[in-house]
Amino acid sequence: MAARYWDKLQDLSQKYKDYVIQNPTGATQLESAVRMLSYLIAGRFADSHELSELVYSASNLLALLNDGILRKELLAPPPTEGSRRRLLTWLGVLESLEVFIEIGAARAWGDRTRWAAILIIQLLKACLRIVLLFWYRAGIQSSPPVTPLDREGILNQAEDNSNSGSSCFVGRRSSRAVRSLDDSASSHRRFWRSPQIHDGKQRNTGETESDKDGSELGTLGTLAEAIHILRPITHLLSLATWGQKSWKPWMVAAALDITSISLLSDVRNLSHRERAELRRRMFLLLYYLLRSPFYNHYTETRLLLLLRLLGDYVPGVGLVARPLMDYLPVWQKIYFYNWG
């Protein structure tokens, strides 16, 4: 009985993989539909926030699953990438579920369990990132850890690889390319559209550079990245020591982030992905204006006044400003929205 259900499950899994490979656009539309559903659910009924976050997490996991299927089938990463890719995938799963786990733990078991769940998640993430940094030489680690695929570019590249010089015929008058029967791919690898003829230039799918080993950071660069990785743990420990209303945890976290960014800015020969991640971290320093206790003492009254003025005097802005004003207190109570 169990073997029969297992066979059915494997058959269903294979059918879904074939569907994603043959219809990546349809898979993308499915992910967007699930994500849109999470927005529609929010605020509709009691416990809608938890359900909305669950659906949103499911959409992120679905995108991660579909990217993994396409990456394995169409890009064929080398076997040596397997263990590193699994660590990145688990890191992506944790980041996709962290908000739902936090609010679910708070709802089911209370605030102490919520903080325990937050600490466990941050410890797991830090351990995975430390292994990637020191064992796999991952360099500056980006967020999200698994770079989303350029699916259209990968499909076109897969077609380019399958369309060698003798694999298709190009009509002289119509310039239309037609595959030969001998060189047609198997049914689950076949793309049901006309082959494209290119000038031989390699397409950039967004995968090549981001999947390479990180740049050589050197001693100071590695120390700076380790500071960035351990900053959430340090912040949680300082919260436990001085309390949530103290300025000390806020200042310690800000000092660690600024120190890490300053040291990493001096590292040369960073890849394009690493430079983009460094710019993202610089921009995220603005989040400290929205983090307590700075938010409670300075930002809250000014931000609410600005949103109220925009909502009252700028046509159409109120549709966004008023729900945002209502949501800000909820957003402030969720740790991973602020400090994740």
Swiss-Prot record:
Keyword Transmembrane annotated: yes
Domain of life assignment = Eukaryota
What's the source species' lineage?
Eukaryota, Metazoa, Chordata, Craniata, Vertebrata
Q: What's this chain's function?
A: Involved in peroxisome biogenesis.
Q: Which family does it belong to?
A: Belongs to the peroxin-16 family.
Give the region (Disordered) as residue ranges. Answer: 196-216
Quick one: where is this thing mainly located?
A: membrane
Q: What name appears for this protein in its UniProt entry?
A: Peroxisomal membrane protein PEX16
